[in-house]
């Protein structure tokens, strides 16, 4: 599973790493758009608004998680490049600890952030209640993906999200169509498919030899490790979070203008999110390749990575 990014053609390494990541990001975007599209095919405007508002909150949480995971990817990659698997194990364990703390602190404030039209309140509450059950699985998926990417493997996370995306579409059609569960069906499809992606990811870790041996000691908070993860991951999370805050402000304004405006804005925001696929892919690629090369004492290759990207 581990891929050495410190030798060979830098340009080839960028393409090999970036393309699977780009496809993964596209599938994640498709994941959210599928909920809205299928809901729109079988339900009314109130259900579309409920799913749009609920998914906006979930996307905000996901952006925070993915941003922090970037810090983990860099620290793991640096440790792998230096051949120090003990530091990589500490980074993985402390990432799990950090994510759990962030989720506990962030969920309630985000839920109370947006004002939902009265007609869509029941559906939004139902959607979020079920999706919150899936938050640990979102976290687990991103932690496992950051481990794979830190080891230089961006293909495995792509396979994990592809399985989840296919399952989500199939379950959405079943739950929202024949079973007529509306927003509840969309949330169930999302949560169950996220659970499946984590199961597949755990199987991937078990099947491949990573050279990592995690123990309880690795999960103990270490100030130095957490500091390095946050130093890199927090600015990324804040940067992407600010973009999502802008979207949420637009959502709040649309919510106060009525049901139809709220639904329309929710759909457009899903389309706009697709525009961030390429820059986000390049950010992840530069982070993974540079961290391994800096860890291996090859700053010139890290500089070449930035130049080519």
Predicted regions and their residues:
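Alpha-helical transmembrane segments of multi-pass membrane proteins
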Residues: 103-105, 118-141, 279
């Amino acid at each position: 599973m581990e891929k050495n990014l410190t030798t060979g053609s830098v340009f080839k390494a960028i393409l090999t790493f970036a393309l699977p990541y780009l496809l993964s990001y596209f599938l994640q975007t498709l994941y959210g758009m599928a909920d809205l599209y299928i809901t729109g095919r079988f339900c009314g405007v109130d259900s579309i608004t409920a799913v749009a508002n609920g998914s906006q909150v979930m996307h905000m949480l996901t952006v925070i998680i993915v941003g922090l995971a970037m810090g983990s990817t860099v620290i793991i990659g640096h440790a792998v490049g230096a051949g120090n698997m003990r530091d990589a194990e500490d980074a993985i364990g402390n990432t799990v600890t950090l994510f759990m703390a962030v989720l506990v602190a962030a969920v309630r404030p985000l839920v109370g952030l947006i004002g939902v039209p009265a007609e869509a309140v029941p559906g939004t509450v139902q959607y979020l209640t079920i999706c919150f059950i899936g938050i640990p699985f979102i976290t687990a998926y991103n932690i496992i993906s950051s481990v794979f990417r830190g080891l230089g493997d961006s293909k495995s996370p792509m396979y994990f999200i592809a399985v989840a995306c296919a399952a989500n579409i199939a379950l959405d059609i079943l739950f929202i169509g024949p079973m007529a569960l509306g927003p509840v069906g969309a949330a169930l499809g999302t949560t169950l498919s996220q659970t499946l992606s984590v199961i597949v990811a755990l199987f991937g870790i078990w099947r491949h030899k990573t050279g990592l041996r995690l123990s309880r000691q690795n999960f103990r908070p270490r100030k130095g490790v957490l500091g390095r993860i946050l130093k890199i991951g927090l600015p990324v999370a804040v940067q992407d979070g600010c973009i999502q805050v802008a979207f949420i402000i637009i959502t709040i304004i649309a919510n106060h203008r009525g049901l139809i405006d709220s639904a329309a804005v929710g759909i457009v925001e899903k389309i706009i999110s697709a525009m961030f696929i390429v820059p986000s892919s390049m950010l992840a690629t530069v982070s993974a390749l540079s961290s391994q090369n800096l860890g291996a004492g090859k700053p010139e290759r890290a500089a070449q990575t930035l130049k080519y990207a």
